[in-house]
Amino acid sequence: AHFFIYSGHGSNMGKNGTGGLVLKDWITNDQIQNELKLKDNALVLFKSVCGGAGSSAGDNGDIGYKEAELRVSDYAEPFLTIGASTYYANNYGDGCVSFLEDFFDGLSIEECYDNSLLWGVNKHISKNYMYQPNLKIAISGSNANSGTHTVISTDSNGVKKSRKVPNSKSYSISYVGNPYFDIGEIYKKKRTYVMNWIKSDSYKI
């Protein structure tokens, strides 16, 4: 498959307690890496998956940049290891649809990502990917509105629960991959993209 799209529960079946899939059975990162067959340069999209873009429905407040980066990194790792070009996660409505529309229009991964950032969404992280430093990881979300609250609803084995938590910084749109990859390269042999960092918020090729 050139496109793998998952919309379901988050999982703790990867290393560091994040990663994997929840289908009929729980699927580990190792199973994805050893059993899933993707075409070279495939795109992997996660829609509204707890932890997939950073934030999870079970969070109590701001998880912090490091935890958000670790979650996204661990979800993405097995797919990128087996040849995917890009991992993209979006917790907003039709965010994945808009991303794909832009990709099919010929935009690069980074352009698709930038276009998917809604009003009020801020860029939190943009740096080398910890497991493959030749790739980029970017994470965005909203900042906290002090004095306000959000109602979190969860459904576990048919039991629905709601709780009110203070609003905090969220991590809701993320990607890992080559920012310059576009649909014109999807059938080409994978090429190497290298980032040389000057400082934390800028880079050159």
What do these predicted ranges mean?
Residues A1-D59, E67, N143, Y175, ...:
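Catalytic-core segments of thiol-dependent peptidases
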Residues G54-I205:
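Active-site-proximal C-terminal subdomain of hydrolase catalytic domains
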